[in-house]
Amino acid sequence: MKTFSPTPENINREWFVVDAEDKILGRLATQIAHRLRGKHKPEFAPHMDNGDFIVVVNCEKIKVTGKKLDQKKYYNHSGYVGGLRETSLEKLLASKPEEVLLKAVRGMLPRNRLGRAMLTKLKVYRGTEHPHAAQKPTPLELTY
């Protein structure tokens, strides 16, 4: 018997919608990253992008444990001397809640061209409305 190696024609991608309300950030991000990579499928191959599309709604209602709202910091640099900016999780959740989940999942994906392609299959929205109704995403109840 030969080992099955998937080809781009064999990849079957599905659309799922996840409600992030009252879910813990890290636990939700790990399961999303797992599905984006396609590791839940028997035909997983580490050199191919065979994961599913994930639509996350209610990202502004995500929870964190402990004192992370005050203590967790996000850094970005402008490229100029002294241009390091620091933002707390609390401020980022208030202004751009989509970025919080995107940054958490990005850190769990491969740091190469394949990881960037996987991240494009993640769609994060505030509220319950999303523009992907035509794809008929099935609700996905993630368990921890």
UniProtKB/Swiss-Prot annotation:
Domain of life: Bacteria
GO process annotations (BP): negative regulation of translation; translation
Record key words, sorted: Ribonucleoprotein, Ribosomal protein
Keyword Ribosomal protein found: yes
Signal peptide limits: none
InterPro entries noted in UniProt: Ribosomal_uL13, Ribosomal_uL13_bac-type, Ribosomal_uL13_CS, Ribosomal_uL13_sf
One example GO MF annotation: mRNA binding
GO cellular component, one term: cytosolic large ribosomal subunit
Function: This protein is one of the early assembly proteins of the 50S ribosomal subunit, although it is not seen to bind rRNA by itself. It is important during the early stages of 50S assembly.
HAMAP family: Ribosomal_uL13
UniProt xrefs under PANTHER family: LARGE RIBOSOMAL SUBUNIT PROTEIN UL13M, RIBOSOMAL PROTEIN L13
Quaternary structure, from the entry: Part of the 50S ribosomal subunit.
Family: Belongs to the universal ribosomal protein uL13 family.
Protein name: Large ribosomal subunit protein uL13
Gene source species: Nitratidesulfovibrio vulgaris (strain ATCC 29579 / DSM 644 / CCUG 34227 / NCIMB 8303 / VKM B-1760 / Hildenborough) (Desulfovibrio vulgaris)
